[in-house]
Amino acid sequence: MPRAIWKGWLAVGQVSCAVALHAAASTSDRVSFHTVNRKTGNRVRREFVDAVSGKPVPREDQVKGYEVAPDEFVQIDPDEIAATIPDSDKCLRIDAFVPCREVDGAYFDKPYYLTPAGDAALEAFALIREGMRARKAAALARTVLFRRLRTVMVRPHGAGLIAHTLNFDYEVRSSAEAFSEIPKLKVKGEMLELAKHIIGTKAGTFDPTAFDDRYDAALAELVKAKLEGRKPKRKAAPKKAREPSDLMAALRESVAATERPRRRKAG
């Protein structure tokens, strides 16, 4: 089992159990690069310099600064920042249970796996998990994680639980603002029926293994080609999408395209 990044308690009312939090997503397997000197091949290091004098600034003289006006900063010392970190009792205290579908995906931040920490926690952990599963509910809990008070949505996931940290309301931009210039159009009749038919023929199941990271694969191929002293394979230019001049004709052609494979199979 991967190392836990946080350990504490999961509590609902007077029922509690020791739990461990594990990262559910990681970018460590992606191709990554260092910055090197083209002439020597040596790695280069980053150095902080004064923006005005151009002189290097020693680490002990570097402090955080909040900009209150152009190039005017209020300096904040590390111990002053540390004093603002909320006190933690290491407890994911459940405040409420809500239907899983009620939390808008725009509020999801990062996913974590939640597991029982030790044999003594197994029974209470299973009780909380199965209770939520039976009610098709998710728990909303709050605790201090990574120096911030976070709201976390917890729900059953296989033999364990999955916990999503949630974005604060002020961090999520209003959809009304993003969609403000979209006119209200009512689609009906044959056009809507054709669209529904196309969607029906494309129905499937979510399989994350079917979605490959083409950029990372291309980077890996580039590195391999460099090591082998050959030119990397040239990628084919993607087919450009364009708006159809006749939407109804495009819908009918799409329906016909889905029907052709069926006819070949039937024949």
UniProtKB/Swiss-Prot annotation:
GO terms for molecular function: double-stranded DNA binding. Pfam families: Ku. Residues 229-267 are annotated as: Disordered. Keywords: DNA damage, DNA recombination, DNA repair, DNA-binding. Residues 11-195 form the Ku domain. GO terms for biological process: DNA recombination; double-strand break repair via nonhomologous end joining. CDD domains: KU_like. It comes from the Bacteria. Belongs to the prokaryotic Ku family. Homodimer. Interacts with LigD. With LigD forms a non-homologous end joining (NHEJ) DNA repair enzyme, which repairs dsDNA breaks with reduced fidelity. Binds linear dsDNA with 5'- and 3'- overhangs but not closed circular dsDNA nor ssDNA. Recruits and stimulates the ligase activity of LigD. This is Non-homologous end joining protein Ku. It comes from Cereibacter sphaeroides (strain KD131 / KCTC 12085) (Rhodobacter sphaeroides).
